[in-house]
Amino acid sequence: SWGDITPIRRTVTGTITFDTTNGSTSVTVNDTGHGAIAGDFVTFSGTTGDPGGIPNASLNNQFEIIEVFNANEYRITSPVAATSTATAAGTADAAYQINTGSDKSFIDFGWGTGTWGLSTWGTPRPPSASLQLLSQVWQFDNYGEKLILQYVDGGIYEWDPASGLAVRATAIAGAPTKSKYALVSTPDRHLVCFGTEDTIGTPNTQDPMFVRFSNQEDINTFVPTATNTAGGQRLTDGNEIITALRSRGQILIWTDTSLHGQQYLGPPYTFGFQQLGANCGCIGPHAAADVNGVAYWMSKDAFFVFDGTVKKIPCTVQDYVFKDINIVQAQKVHVGINTQFNEVTWWYCSFTSDYIDRFVTYNYLENVWHIGSMARTAWADIGTFEKPIATEYDPESTAATLTTIYGLTAGRSMLYNQEDGVNGAGSPIFAYIYSGYFDIGDGDDMLLMSRFIPDFKNQVGNLTVRLLLRAFPQASASPSSLDPYVITPTTEKVDTRARGRQIQLRIESDELDSNWRFGTMRVDLQKDGLR
């Protein structure tokens, strides 16, 4: 079953009123000091008076706030049009979800950017990291049966599944209200906040390099005393803490430039901290993963592994990734583990995209890389589920949602069962494998391929084999005269008559329910002269 546990930041009882215009679905909501921004969500209940002729039941729903006029008024879209013009009509209760934040990061060039007198009037100012507004990215952890929720530069919330899906997550009393990241240290069970407040409950005292941890077995107590295990530590080497991860025997903490270890020692110090690496920072809060005690992560210009020491991973596609990545959207970089295939995959935004559209995968057993185009914004490996579970955010989608939200603008998330079946959400998957160019006698002789014998296991549907030929390494490739060759499950051999100094083999399929596994293909090759 599904439920919405998004925390509620404000509730109002009986003082909401509505302004309507005859024949219009646009409704102005009156609520003094509402604190909402466009894109937030509000749920009304207990509506009275059928405001402007709109039935109470039509307003007792969840709405997206379309436009904010001022601190006391905003606009929603009613499911039905008003039948009269009214001002401050009816009454209602309201529950406001926490501010949605932005679905993308951007550089703020607004009034006040830079120092007085910088450059000339009308000239764009250089970007400033202190003025980068980040997308709202969440992280989750478990504290026993409870779920811990926190978003970057936000507060920390908890949700108890025993309360049921009708009960929302609530702020953890006594916890910091502004942190970069949070997780639970195990097995000692401290709640640890990274890049958090010097003074608990005072957001403007946030220190992006300060680590604070709660009392053991008590996530509501962060103030250290002589009789508890709460405390804190400021790290060095970096401008801000980016993320943290439980690993073998310690918590790994990444700043934008370095890696640190946090180990549980017990009283009187509780935790010990040491720097493990430099010039190896992490690109985003979800860009590091642990596989059997070995950590893999993506920085702003390379990939790294920590297995006791920090090492840069040789990457054959490094230029492809880092010369075409949108660093402004680094907050969205997300890593997923697929243990079934020994893979670690990072999803990221290409240079011209504000939303995830690319991935790069590293097979840590075979030390090979591959790349592709796919949008996934969250990933859970097998374990709790039989197959990996992933989500995709589509900023342009207007499809129906699981819960009815009136006035909902574009932007939807989809949930996928990964590695299940051979199609992609009901559509064919374009599958392919290419060989390198091969030759005879280091390319001195022409090469004649007269035929090949296909060898495909578990083949369902047809696939295509193509032969690309070229006379010189720098020459353009051209297909053979009989290209392409369609291979059915019963094809025994294929005559080709392909001639060139170098030949590349390409195998492709793009049919619904297509499935195949490449075996050992045999080809009939021979020398065919020097020109």
Model features per residue range: what roles?
Residues 1-2, 102-107, 111, 116-120, ...:
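Beta-sheet repeat architectures centered on beta-propellers
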Residues 3-136, 165, 170-171:
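Small/polar beta-strand repeat architecture
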Residues 30-35, 76-85, 152, 162, ...:
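Secondary-structure transition/turn motif
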Residues 33-48, 191-193, 443-459, 505:
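Beta-rich globular "head" domains
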Residues 119-133, 164-333:
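Beta-propeller and closely related beta-pinwheel folds
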Residues 144-146, 188-192, 250-252, 295, ...:
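Entry beta-strands of beta-propeller and related beta-repeat scaffolds
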Residues 145-159:
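Hydrophobic or amphipathic alpha-helical targeting/insertion segments
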Residues 150, 193-194, 254, 262, ...:
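Residue-level marker for isolated small/hydroxyl-bearing positions within beta-strands
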